[in-house]
């Protein structure tokens, strides 16, 4: 099943995608699309739900994400293009919750940004508490999978100390969605094609089968150090083709650029890049 949240920022409603690819309004079944509400949402008679007209905005497809755990350098070719050693165990960092963004909302570069970059990634939404979970049971703890763009500011990430979160956690830097897709519909998470274009030019092409550490290994590993709760989001690394790795010269995002990305079975995203402005108290997600 494919679940979503649709509507203006801060006013999203829960939805489900029907057999024709249309949004059906779930708000008469559940008040919000949280992990706790998924069981009731799955039991809905989809054909009887109100059809949502037009093309509403998609928000982050699940409400109540508690934390964003990210895995770096999880594709061998990406580690090589980044001039970094291939990890012998997963490299973990965190993205700020304030970086959450709708899948087609604008990405706002931070003030004085010069090294904005893109990363198409498979996201994993946790459905049950994970604490010292074995690899064998790890996938049973997954509520669903999502498409994520792990937008980055490489100068802040790498040139101003060693805390990657400084370059990964800027506002709008974690577009998620359009859908939360249940594991039964995705099948094997280690065989999903993925791509990303910038201004119509293909930049990244890959498949999750080339991950260094697979999804089950990552959930098990992370759960040894950080308890994962229902609704937590783990993003699993990106294939080669990021801007900083382009030859003979790196390519970085600028205002007006358009990123378009997708993962097989998980849908597509489109974001226009904007220059920095004060975002005030805008609600993200």
Swiss-Prot record:
Record flagged with keyword Phosphoprotein: no
GO terms under biological process: rhamnose metabolic process
Pathway named in the protein's UniProt entry: Carbohydrate degradation; L-rhamnose degradation
Residues binding pyruvate: 73, 168, 238
Effect of residue 91 to A: No change in hydrolase activity
InterPro entries: FAH, Fumarylacetoacetase-like_C, Fumarylacetoacetase_C_sf
Molecular function in Gene Ontology: hydrolase activity; metal ion binding
Binding site for Mg(2+): 119, 121, 150
EC number: 3.7.1.26
Record's keyword terms, sorted: Hydrolase, Magnesium, Metal-binding, Rhamnose metabolism
Outcome reported for the amino acid change (mutating residue 121 to A): Loss of hydrolase activity
Top EC class of this enzyme: hydrolase
Names of required cofactors: Mg(2+)
Reactions accelerated catalytically: 2,4-didehydro-3-deoxy-L-rhamnonate + H2O = (S)-lactate + pyruvate + H(+)
Source organism superkingdom: Bacteria
Keyword Magnesium applies: yes
Cofactor binding mode and count: Binds 1 Mg(2+) ion per subunit.
Consequence of changing residue 82 to A: No change in hydrolase activity
Subunit structure: Homodimer.
Function, in words: Hydrolase that catalyzes the hydrolysis of 2,4-didehydro-3-deoxy-L-rhamnonate to pyruvate and L-lactate. In vitro can also use acylpyruvates such as acetylpyruvate and trimethylacetopyruvate. Catalyzes the fifth (last) step in an alternative pathway for rhamnose utilization that does not involve phosphorylated intermediates.
UniProt similarity note: Belongs to the FAH family.
Protein name from the UniProt record: 2,4-didehydro-3-deoxy-L-rhamnonate hydrolase
